């Protein structure tokens, strides 16, 4: 068993201001997306997007992630609770975000952005898709530092006891699994795959399939939310939300891979 490195969730204090690691990781995540996107633009990888376009897209995507992530959590995970306590929807400092909701928020942002800039939707989504995984990796590192979203009990040699779980049981460090698979591995695959010209929509399709598949697998080691538990077929909410991602990605890939009709 490995020792869980208990880290103060507050990264920096400036007078009364406390900067938490989790918020800092969000900032680092968006900074990584910007740096990688800027590199691709300035290297001539794309001629459809400018650096100013990237800056605008990231700014609005922050809103999409926060609003979509919060509303997704409210609707997917605790609708009855927030229906009874609607004002708590705005208590963002108490946590409660959904990746799948954040993804929907970003998709809406990309649709509006593409329309405003008169670009094809897949021109935008194929450009941004390979940049997202490292941002996700930063977020999962924030989860690990906070000691939240821990895994299920296990006896594997690298199990850790997360103090916040309250039961003292060794558990999978599932946040690190997600960091590795949904973050680093998915980034490497998409960066390589998108380095060559692809049909419009195929890079986006690979992101949907890759993230959905990795998240589905990791959920087998992640402790289900205690207020939900496992759902139909013994699957978690995260798995049920990931299945449509994989199916949509596969359908999009097959559709865009068709030879043009004559």
Swiss-Prot record:
InterPro entries: Lgt. The chain crosses the membrane at residues 17-37, 57-77, 95-115, 119-139, 173-193, 200-220, 227-247. GO terms for biological process: lipoprotein biosynthetic process. A 1,2-diacyl-sn-glycero-3-phospho-(1'-sn-glycerol) binds at residue 140. It is an enzyme of class 2 (transferase). It comes from the Bacteria. PROSITE patterns: LGT. Its EC number is 2.5.1.145. Pathway: Protein modification; lipoprotein biosynthesis (diacylglyceryl transfer). Keywords: Cell inner membrane, Cell membrane, Membrane, Transferase, Transmembrane, Transmembrane helix. It is found in: Cell inner membrane. GO terms for cellular component: plasma membrane. It is a multi-pass membrane protein. One of its GO terms (molecular function) is phosphatidylglycerol-prolipoprotein diacylglyceryl transferase activity. Belongs to the Lgt family. Catalyzes the transfer of the diacylglyceryl group from phosphatidylglycerol to the sulfhydryl group of the N-terminal cysteine of a prolipoprotein, the first step in the formation of mature lipoproteins. PANTHER family: PHOSPHATIDYLGLYCEROL--PROLIPOPROTEIN DIACYLGLYCERYL TRANSFERASE, PROLIPOPROTEIN DIACYLGLYCERYL TRANSFERASE. This is Phosphatidylglycerol--prolipoprotein diacylglyceryl transferase. It comes from Bordetella parapertussis (strain 12822 / ATCC BAA-587 / NCTC 13253). The gene is lgt.
């Amino acid at each position: 068993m490995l020792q869980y490195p208990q880290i103060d969730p507050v990264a920096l204090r400036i007078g009364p201001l406390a900067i938490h690691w989790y918020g800092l990781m969000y900032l680092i995540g968006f900074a990584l997306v910007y740096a990688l996107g800027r590199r691709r633009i300035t290297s001539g990888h794309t001629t459809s997007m400018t650096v100013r376009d990237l800056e605008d897209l990231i700014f609005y995507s922050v809103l999409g992630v926060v609003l979509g992530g919060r509303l997704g959590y409210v609707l997917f995970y605790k609708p009855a609770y927030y229906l009874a306590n609607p004002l708590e929807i705005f208590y963002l400092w108490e946590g409660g975000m959904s990746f799948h909701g954040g993804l929907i928020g970003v998709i809406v942002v990309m649709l509006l952005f593409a329309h405003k800039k008169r670009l094809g939707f897949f021109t935008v989504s194929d450009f941004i898709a390979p940049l997202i995984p490292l941002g996700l990796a930063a977020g999962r590192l924030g989860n690990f530092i906070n000691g939240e979203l821990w895994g299920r009990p296990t006896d594997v040699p690298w199990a850790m006891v997360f103090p916040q779980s309250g039961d003292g049981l060794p558990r999978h460090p599932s946040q690190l699994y997600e960091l590795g698979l949904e973050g680093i591995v998915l980034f490497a695959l998409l960066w390589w795959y998108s380095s060559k010209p692809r049909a419009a929509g195929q890079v986006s399709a690979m992101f949907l399939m890759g993230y959905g598949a990795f998240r589905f697998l990791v959920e087998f080691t992640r402790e289900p939310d205690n207020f939900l538990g496992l759902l139909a077929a013994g699957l978690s909410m995260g798995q049920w939300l990931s299945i449509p991602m994989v199916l949509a990605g596969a359908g999009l890939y097959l559709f865009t891979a068709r030879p043009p009709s004559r």
